[in-house]
Amino acid sequence: LGDVYKRQKAMFVEDGSDVQAKNGILHEIDSWLPLWESEIPVLVEWDFADYEEVAAWVNGGYGDPDQKYQTVDEGEHQSDVSSLACYTIDAKSSATSTDGSNGGYYPVGYATPKTGSAWTNCKNKDHIYLNLGYNGSIIMKTPILIAGKYKVILKVTYATSMNFMRTMTSGSNGGKIRFTFDGDSETTTEIPIYASITANTLGLYDTVIYDEIEFSKTGTHSMKMVIADPAATSNSKFRIQLDYMTFEPIIEDE
């Protein structure tokens, strides 16, 4: 094997090549083919609900029995996915009911919109609700990111009942969230994710979380979000609604 790795290329095995198969010709090689790994960051869109566990849970009927994964319906649907392994949560006391089947919002709710709603424009036709209370938190793993610098943009969903967050009234600071990557305090930033919305109109909106953040290693990363808006303990309409996060590469000229 040592000689093969030193050669750094795979060779055809003559006796095992040109073998007729049903859908083509088989050729045997004597080593692994090398894997190519980009060193240049690429655009990544991270859908917070795009997990196999969520799909299996919803389609298995463990949530709202009328809900189908990534599917628009005549009515809105919400399933409780708080216990799934893709979400690590620390829920605190909340002024908002956590009974998502009776007008409240689960600690982590998987939501699909109704036909005709602006939320049908969500990535993959779904989004998540967070009802974790003041200083409650959630940790998730990102998709693989190539080492490099990125601008990070959060796509949020907004309803008119959240106007007090948009206007930063009734004790709200705009839906402020504290973001941290990989437990590194140097990456921590607090952003009022609804304060930049200019009109009280149901829809999807972008909020810049980082103008620039650098990841030194290629791989997945842990992202923690802490609810830093005290209105979570005082307003029964408080919740956070998220669609996806975009990692936009920053390519610097050499």
Language model regions located:
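Short, small-residue-biased leader/transition segments that mark boundaries at the very start
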Residues: 1-5
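Extracytoplasmic
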Residues: 32-254
